[in-house]
Amino acid sequence: MTVQIENRDNGIQVVRLTGASASKSFSRESLPIIADAIDKGLKNSEIKGMVITGEGKFFSAGADINAFQESIEANEAPQLIRDLTNILHPLLMRIRESSTIVVAAINGAAAGGGLGLALACDARIASPKAKLAASYASIGLSPDGGTTWLLPRLVGEQRSRQFFFENQIWNAEESANAGAIDEVVNEDELINRSIEIAINWSQWGNHFREATKHLLHVQTLNDFETHLKH
């Protein structure tokens, strides 16, 4: 089983990516399973908060690089990218728009599309072993998974330029200092602290959570007068 689901008290669900779903999250095999597991939690009215985490060295390592290299050599990369983004991008939108509070408990590497998954969450808590990486430049592809939209909103445009164009890898402390991660906690505290935040943020009514997430989402897209009308 590549995704483990654990229901906790107070309407909190822990979604743990294991095995290939953590180390090669965005493959044709793993991504549909991940999306289905997260979607079921988002659609469940009894789940008010969700914690997404990984296993071992990986939170979510993004694409299967070998599969991408093979698709490039076979001139099939555009179709592979379409197949994956047709699942990933709607999933990220549902996370952003859902009334469910979603917390990323980043235990290890969040790379490529896995970085997009972490950035789309409402909060990001990390262990000292966490790493954030884009990892697109090395395979000649532009960043995906909404990372070029999400990261600048957290750390600023110029800091994001440095991150992408220098193909940087941020450790937990660097990520927190930049503003990409909210807190760094001891490894053995990661899940409990993430659950604590999910409980705290999800204690309010469904409409408040959904409307507030929506307003925060659109606040940079509209001028102030238009924003006041939402």
Can you say where each PLM-predicted feature lies in the sequence?
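Terminal peptide-recognition signature
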Residues: 15, 33-34, 52, 64, ...
